[in-house]
Amino acid sequence: TRNQTPDVPTAQHGVVLPAGAALTVTAQQANVSRLRARGIDVSARYAFDLGPGRLGLKLAGTWLKEHITQTTPGISSGDVISDGAYSNPHLKASLTTTYDIGQFGVALNTRFHGDGLGDANASSAEEYDDNTVPSRTYHDLSARYSFDNGHTVNFGVSNLFDTQPPYMGFGEPGIYANASVYDLVGRAYNLTWNYTF
């Protein structure tokens, strides 16, 4: 809004402003950023009888070709590249193997998180001594037994081989980073008891 009374002090500032001077400016936020992601997701499942039980296999994977956030339309220098970063590697996959015999079953889940860059937007290769983060593979093992009365007991070991997270030396908090990507706890055990009625 603009000043319509040039001879009267403004309520906001207590001073006399010339006619037409800006008193307030109303600025609205606009969501103009855009995320562009391209890649391929694949999954396959197969099960067959083996010996006294049934073996099941499930494979799922993602190949990420492009993951770019456009912060300012028309200005590519502000784009944030995430594909190839350690949090968005080009390749992620998991393989779940199950074997069931009657009321007993075991499962092994293998998770692969591909290698990546600590900073995918680094201006040059010399910006960091080592900008790479190696891949990690985790194995989770579980076993269950279902009783006739509706009770089921499950025992599991996550990160079976106690695989350690990668070291990150490029500004991340602490020497190991991002618990949403890597297992920071190490090998862990869990026991659950379920009842269905």
Q: PLM ranges: what are they?
A:
Residues A30-R34, D130-V133, S180:
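Outer-membrane beta-barrel proteins
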Residues T1, T72-V80, S123-Y128, P166-A179:
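Flexible, surface-exposed loop regions and adjacent strand-edge segments
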Residues T1-N121:
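Gram-negative outer-membrane beta-barrel transporters
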Residues K65, R111-A122, R144-F197:
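C-terminal beta-signal and adjacent terminal beta-strands/loops
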Residues D129-N131, R144-Y145:
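Hydrophobic alpha-helical bundle architecture
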Residues R36-R38, P89, S135-T137, N149, ...:
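Residue-level preference for beta-strand/loop junctions
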Residues G114, V133-S135:
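Non-catalytic C-terminal accessory modules of carbohydrate-active enzymes
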Residues H90-S94, R136-D140, A188-N190:
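Transmembrane beta-barrel architecture of outer membranes
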